[in-house]
């Protein structure tokens, strides 16, 4: 039932789509004024980016909040690049899903794999990453499971460590897989424009 309700929300949204550089960009405008923008790989339909934007109390549009995809460093000028150089040793957290798993990558974590503990906190509905040396702690939610009103399961969680990057995977429940499949069918019905990025509302 929960899957259907989230799908209905997506179906009821006003959608525009743009195809560019091998990516399908979809912009959703919901009845409550919220906006969601997604980017998919045109060939594989793999989700590359998902971000949200809401209006503030005064009705002005806020900044896009990234849910899936690689964060773009703020500040494009020389000052921005200097700031990036200064902070490039800090852990960088990002989400990049696969077809069958939600996946998060935390870069710049040099400790061996046995130092990390990754677990589900049922009451808080989040995943917690800890290190036995107390050098790193991170708590994050899985918005997809919240939207579908599905429980978090420890058994769906796994992690690996390589090249100073901790890779955390959570196997997508069958309900989410089914909803994503239905959404792809729905998106094929949306009239898709071809053109420059400036044509798309989400840019």
Curated annotation (Swiss-Prot):
Q: Which Pfam families match?
A: DPCD
A biological-process GO annotation = epithelial cilium movement involved in extracellular fluid movement
Which InterPro entries is this protein grouped with?
A: DPCD (IPR026224)
GO CC annotations?
extracellular region
All disulfide bonds of the chain are none
The record's similarity note reads:
Belongs to the DPCD family.
> What functional role does this protein have?
May play a role in the formation or function of ciliated cells.
Q: What is this protein called?
A: Protein DPCD
């Amino acid at each position: 039932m929960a899957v259907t309700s989230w799908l209905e929300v997506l179906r009821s949204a006003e959608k525009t789509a743009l195809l560019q550089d091998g990516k399908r960009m979809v912009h959703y405008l919901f009845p409550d004024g919220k906006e969601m923008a997604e980017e998919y790989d045109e060939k594989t339909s793999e989700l590359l980016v998902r971000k949200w934007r809401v209006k503030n109390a005064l009705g002005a549009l806020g900044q896009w909040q990234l849910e899936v995809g690689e964060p773009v460093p703020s500040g494009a000028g020389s000052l921005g690049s200097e700031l990036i150089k200064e902070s490039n040793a800090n852990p960088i957290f990002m989400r990049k899903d696969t077809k069958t798993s939600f996946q998060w990558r935390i870069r710049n974590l040099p400790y061996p794999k046995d130092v990390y503990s990754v677990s589900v906190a049922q009451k808080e509905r989040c995943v917690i990453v800890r290190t036995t040396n107390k050098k790193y702690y991170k708590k994050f939610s899985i918005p997809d499971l919240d939207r579908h009103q599905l429980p978090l399961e420890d058994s769906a969680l796994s992690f690996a460590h390589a090249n100073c990057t901790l890779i955390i995977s959570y196997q997508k429940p069958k309900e989410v897989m089914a909803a994503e499949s239905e959404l792809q069918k729905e998106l094929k019905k949306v009239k898709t424009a071809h053109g420059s990025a400036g044509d798309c509302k989400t840019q």
